[in-house]
Structure formats: C-alpha cells, structure tokens
Amino acid sequence: VEEFADKPGVIGFTVTSTRYKPVHANEYMRLYSMIEETGKPIAFHAGYHWQDPSLATCNSFLGMHALGFAWCNIVHMTNWVLNGIPERFPKLKSVWIESGLSWIPFVMQRLDDQYLMRMSEAPLLKQMPSDYMRQNCWYTCQPMEKSSEVGLKATFEMINAKTQLLYASDWPHFDFDAPRVIAEIPWIDEE
C-alpha cells in the first residue's frame, strides 16, 4: 500500500481468496487501516481450488464452478461483517468480485436472522448485517445470473444495485459478461 497507493492508475487493492488466515485476523488490521487512509477500495476476488475441504466432494466442474466462486466470498463476507470490519474501518469500501450476485440475498437474510438470535457473538455491530452489505459493499455483475428475472430483480433491490453494482467483464474467460449484459435488462433505466 505504501509503495503503490499514489502510483498513477492504481485505483484500489485486491485480495485473492485467502487460504491462510481469515479476513478478520488481527494481522490484517494495519493493512485495512492503510487502505482506508488512501480512500481507495479493497476488493475480494473470488476463487476456489479443488483441495478446499468444504468443496472437495463436488465431482464436476459444473458443481465446483457454480459453488466455488460464491463460497469464497460467502465465507469472507460473513467474517467481514460479523467481525465488525465495517465498524472498525467505516470509510473502507469493499468490492466483491467474480462471485455473481445470487449469493448476496441469501447471506443478507441468513446473517440478519442469526444475528437477531445471537447478537452477543457480533458485539461490534451497530446495525443489521444486511445494512453493512448494502452500504459499505459494492458488487461486480460478473457473472450476471440472468436465468431468473424475478430473482435478479429482487437481488438488485436487496443490494441497492443502483449505487452498489459495478460492471466487470472477466474477459477473456468463457463466461465473461459483455457490457450489454446490463444494458439488455429490460427494467433498468439509462441511469
């Protein structure tokens, strides 16, 4: 951060899927503070590997690809919010990349539900987990899951897509999103 924050073209910092320490480990707090001071976001880029014990029982690329990218960010988001990172670093923007969008409403609802029963396990929170996810987090469209227009519309509403959705292509991967992926959604206006 110290070396690159002021370099031309640096617009933020990316963390690939962590496989060593969770995102709430104290070792990262200085890093989060430094990134927050730059005013630039931290981005979590989803990624999976076949050796992840929680995904090792998937026996096809289809299953692993469908679950793996979302699973990484589900775990990171859960730890990010419940451990009060948005409270500790209120000006730190987080971006959640390449895990699609459909997992977000599930995590919002599930965390809110569980939080209401166990608030003592998340003592740093001053609002509902979903509120942090709607206000302090941005999400990339890639891959845009368009198989259910009803589901996508509900997701857009829940994440406050008008302000929190970012375009990402993931070119040249096979499942990249061309710009039209957003432009062709019939209920989205030019704004």
Q: Where are the model-predicted features located?
A:
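H/E-rich (His + Asp/Glu) clusters that bind or coordinate divalent metals
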Residues: 46, 52, 58-84, 88, ...
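Active-site gating/metal-coordination segments in enzymes
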Residues: 1-76, 83
